[in-house]
Amino acid sequence: MGSLGDELSLGSIFGRGVSMNVVAVEKVDEHVKKLEEEKRKLESCQLELPLSLQILNDAILYLKDKRCSEMETQPLLKDFISVNKPIQGERGIELLKREELMREKKFQQWKANDDHTSKIKSKLEIKRNEEKSPMLLIPKVETGLGLGLSSSSIRRKGIVASCGFTSNSMPQPPTPAVPQQPAFLKQQALRKQRRCWNPELHRRFVDALQQLGGPGVATPKQIREHMQEEGLTNDEVKSHLQKYRLHIRKPNSNAEKQSAVVLGFNLWNSSAQDEEETCEGGESLKRSNAQSDSPQGPLQLPSTTTTTGGDSSMEDVEDAKSESFQLERLRSP
C-alpha cells in the first residue's frame, strides 16, 4: 500500500510533468535556433528563394507558438503545487525554481526573437505589396468565351467612373460653364488708358519748361515734379517732350529751307544774267565784224552770220584736206 501510495502521490506526478515540460521547451528552442541559422543563410539570397524563406518563417512562428502554449501551462502547475507544498519534497521545489529561471530567460529570448521576426515579416509584406501593386494596375484581358472576373469588374468600374457615379455619392448635374471674355477684350481692359493732353495741361507743361530753362535742359522728372499732376508718369512726360521738341524744330527747318531756296534762286539769276551779258557782248562783236566785212545792203541777218562763218571755216578745212590728198596721189608713181 505504501508503495502504491508513493506511485499515486501528486508530488511524483508533478515532478514528472515539470521535467517533461522543461525538456519539451528545450527541444523547441533547439529547433528554433537551427531554423534561425538556416534563415540567416537564406536571407542573403532571399530574392532567389522567397518560398523557402517563407516556409522557415512559418516554421519558426509555429514552434514559438508551441513554446508559448507550453509555458502558459506552467503557472497552473506552479499554483497547484504551491497549495500542496507539504506533499512535495525538496527536489520538486528546486526543479520549480530552476524551471522558473529558465522560463524567464527563454521568455526574454523569445520576445527578442519575436520582435526580430516581426520586423522581417513586415518588410517582406511591404515588398510583396510593392510587387503586387503594379500588377493590379494592369487589367486582365482574355480572349474567347472565358473572360475573367477582374476584366468585367474593371469595365464596370470604368463605366461607373465615366458616368460620374461613386459608391458614396449620387450623380450630380454638370456645373454650368462660365462665359469667358475674348483675349483682345482682356488686353484692352488691362491696357492703361492713354493720357489726354488738354490745353490746360499743355499750358502747364510749357510753363514748367520755361521755368526749368527750356526743352533742351529740362528733364521729364523735373517737369513732372513741377507740374504736380496726379497720375502723370515720367514716360508720358518724356513722350510729350519729344513731340514738343519736334514741333519746335519744324518752323526753323522750313525757314532754313526757304532761305536756301531763295539764295539758290538769286545765285541762279545772277549767273544767268552774266551769261546773257557775255552772249550779248559776243553777238555785238560778231555783228560789228560781219557788218564791216559784208557789203551794206537792205537786209541784215546777224543771227546767220555766225553760223555761216562757222560753215565756211569747216568747208575751207575740207577743201585743204582734199587738195593735200590729191597732191599725194600725184606724187606717188
UniProtKB/Swiss-Prot annotation:
Q: Which GO terms describe its biological process?
A: regulation of DNA-templated transcription
Task: Using the record's annotation, list all stretches that form the HTH myb-type domain.
Answer: 189-249
Which positions make up the signal peptide? none
Q: Which cysteines are joined by disulfide bonds?
A: none
On the tree of life, the source organism's domain of life is: Eukaryota
Alphabetical GO CC annotations of the entry are: nucleus
Q: Which Pfam families match?
A: Myb_DNA-binding
The GO molecular function terms of this record are:
DNA-binding transcription factor activity; transcription cis-regulatory region binding
Biased composition regions of type Basic and acidic residues, renumbered to the chain: 319-333
Q: Where is this region: Disordered?
A: 274-333
Q: Where in the cell is it found?
A: Nucleus
DNA-binding residue intervals: 220-245
Query: What keywords tag this UniProt record?
Result: DNA-binding, Nucleus, Transcription, Transcription regulation
Q: Which NCBIfam families match?
A: myb_SHAQKYF
Q: What is this protein called?
A: Transcription factor HHO6
Source organism (scientific name): Arabidopsis thaliana
